[in-house]
Every structure is written in structure tokens, then in C-alpha cells.
Amino acid sequence: MNIKNQKPKGKMVLRTLAMPADTNANGDIFGGWIMSQMDIGGAILAKEIARGRVVTVSVNGMTFLKSVSVGDVVSCYAHCIRTGNTSITIKIEVWIKKVSSEPLGKFYCTTEAIFVYVAVDEFGQPKTLLPFSII
């Protein structure tokens, strides 16, 4: 696929603004903050699928494609790629829109990864997923 024709995959699960407090020593947005936003967004979708509590058990293939700047609008898109007996595997993409730095208005993918969540009961023990239709 031509990168100019690329669009986010999945549904928007989180949208926020990159702030100065989220920068690293170089002035770019800290990768750990981006990963945290991805985990929050992915957990929202996983909770909908599990119909309850979930915990993150792994992050695979975290790829940072481009840096994120202060003032960028950060959006996390997620879609379920697999479910197991208790686990939910979700592909998450971070897309940013430049609103306060050049090139203004540009919208592109900056980060992607696969997160695995496990449904848990009130005691934190794995819980079997109920049948569902993927959201």
C-alpha cells in the first residue's frame, strides 16, 4: 500500500494532546508516554470485549516510526486480531495530526504494536471469555 493512501485500522479508542510535560531530554515526546497511551486505549477495547477487567500481559513488536512533537494531537486506533480462551490480542496504531508545528495538518502513523490482554475475575484470576461479536 502506498504510504500516502494509508489510513488507520480499527476504531479510535483514545485521543489526547502531547504536552510539554511528556517530553524526553531531546524535546520529543517520550516513547514511554506513547506506550502508556497505547496500553490505555487497547485496554478500553479489551474491556469491551471481555465485558469486565483485563490486565496487560505482553507487548510485541513495538515500532516507533516517527517522532511526536509537543502540541500534536495523538490518536490511538485499535482492532482485535485474535481471542483465546482468556486472552485478547489487539493491534494498536498511534496516528498524529500536526496542529502546532510543521507540516500543519499532516496526519500519519507514528507507532504500532500488538498488545495481549487477559480477562480476569474480581480476584485477579484468568476468566474465560464469553462469546461476543468483535467490535
Curated annotation (Swiss-Prot):
**GO biological process, any:** fatty acid catabolic process
Q: Which domain of life is it from?
A: Bacteria
Q: Name one GO cellular component term.
A: cytosol
Q: What is its EC number?
A: 3.1.2.-
Tagged with keyword Hydrolase: yes
Domain annotation HotDog ACOT-type: ranges: 8-123
Q: Name one GO molecular function term.
A: long-chain fatty acyl-CoA hydrolase activity
Which InterPro entries does the annotation name? Cytosol_ACT, HOTDOG_ACOT, HotDog_dom_sf, Thioestr_dom
Gene3D superfamilies under this entry? Hotdog Thioesterase (3.10.129.10)
Identify the keywords attached in UniProt to this record, alphabetized: Hydrolase
So what family is this one in?
A: Belongs to the acyl coenzyme A hydrolase family.
Q: What is this protein called?
A: Uncharacterized acyl-CoA thioester hydrolase bbp_254
